């Protein structure tokens, strides 16, 4: 009887070891993105692409430009899902007009207009990349993204 138990135990150990061994290769880590130039011209180009992506519903690249504090508010998947399920904003494309240093805590300001309304986004240069600060740029959106999905839909008045 002890021999049967020992054989069974050995078989379990061998099976467990076989199941846990990985025959696949580890995923290659993505190549790091090239650094962004630390210039007003580079920020203006990036802010224009950022606003165009948002205006046209390409939300992934928008989220990727958010700073860490902003990304901590909502996951990328939830951000994209909410905007796909409940599109917000104007049907008019924005026009990004300028970028300059001059905001709080060293922020750079990207000035843009939507349908004649002048707006400002706050950007920082972090680890050789331009990142968007949602908290400074759009505090009202922060409140919306902290809501549950059903509260978000109700607050924006979308049919869901």
Place the predicted regions along the sequence by residue.
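Low-complexity, intrinsically disordered terminal/linker segments enriched in charged
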Residues: 134-160
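Short solvent-exposed beta->alpha transition segments
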Residues: 37-38, 44-49, 56-107
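C-terminal motif of bacterial Sec signal peptides marking the signal peptidase cleavage site
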Residues: 15-18
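Extracellular mucin-like PTS domains
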Residues: 29-32
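Bacterial N-terminal signal peptides that target proteins for export
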Residues: 1-8
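Surface-exposed, charged secondary-structure patches
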Residues: 80-127, 134-142
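Bacterial signal peptide processing site
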Residues: 20-22
């Amino acid at each position: 009887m002890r021999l049967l138990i020992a054989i069974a135990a050995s078989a379990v150990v061998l099976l467990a070891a076989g199941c846990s061994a990985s025959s696949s290769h580890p995923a290659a880590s993505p190549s790091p993105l090239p650094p962004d130039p630390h210039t007003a011209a580079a920020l203006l180009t990036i802010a224009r692409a950022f606003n165009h992506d948002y205006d046209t519903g390409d939300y992934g690249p928008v989220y990727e430009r958010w700073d860490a504090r902003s990304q901590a508010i909502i996951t990328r998947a939830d951000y994209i899902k909410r905007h796909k399920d409940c599109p917000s904003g104007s049907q008019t494309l924005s026009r990004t007009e300028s970028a300059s240093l001059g905001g709080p805590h060293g922020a750079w300001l990207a000035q843009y207009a939507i349908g004649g309304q002048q707006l400002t986004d706050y950007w920082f240069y972090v680890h050789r990349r331009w990142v968007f600060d949602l908290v400074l740029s759009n505090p009202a959106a922060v409140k919306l993204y902290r809501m549950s999905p059903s509260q978000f839909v109700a607050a924006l008045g979308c049919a869901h």
